[in-house]
Amino acid sequence: MDWLATRLREAGKTVLVTREPGGTPLAESIRNVLLAPSDEKMADDTELLLVFAARAQHLAEKIRPALERGDWVLSDRFVDATWAYQGAGRGLDQDAISRLEALVVRDTQPDMTLLFDVPVDVGMARAGKRAALDRIEQEDRAFFERIRQCYQERAGNEPDRFRVLDASCDLDQVRAQLQPLLEEMLTWS
């Protein structure tokens, strides 16, 4: 994200780099609740509602104002993550997710979605190298297989929006895959 934001800024673009859940003080507080390991099991519906609560705040406070100014927004995750994690990963009701998306996201949709795809074993190994796993990172392999499959299906169903990158390679190779996408983005008005 930082590499892409730097290249866009060098091309004269004003760029907001953000993440979900999070991106504002309130949304970051919700993120902390979502990700903190706890002895109390969080209900799946609670997780879904918290994700959308953080997103509503993020859209209102950061994303929509940036877009209204004509800024570019690079977000590490957005609504596709909800379909993957809460929809496929948790098996939550698709209609409920659709209704929440319509209520919260409305017509604020990405122009392009970059899917940094890695085999589940690679992703889990990378996460395992961090100091401590968060609540979601502690899930089992089957959970992450469902998530990856959902992302791949969404990318296949929306090829005009998604660009799939092989993120199992080293950082320089990932950046090499990003370069033509950056050039494509810079043709946008």
Q: Where are each of the predicted segments found?
A:
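NTP-dependent small-molecule kinase module
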Residues: 3-7, 121-189
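ATP-dependent small-molecule kinase phosphotransfer cores
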Residues: 11-105, 177
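A generic structural signal for alpha->beta connector loops
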Residues: 12-14, 70, 110, 159-162
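Hydrophobic/aromatic beta-strand patches that form the interior of the parallel beta-sheet core
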Residues: 18, 74, 112-114, 163-165
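Active-site donor-binding loop signature of nucleotide-sugar glycosyltransferases
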Residues: 20, 53, 118, 138, ...
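Conserved anionic group-binding/transfer micro-motifs
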Residues: 51, 114, 174
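A glycine- and Lys/Arg-enriched "phosphate-lid" helix/loop adjacent to the NTP-binding pocket
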Residues: 82-149
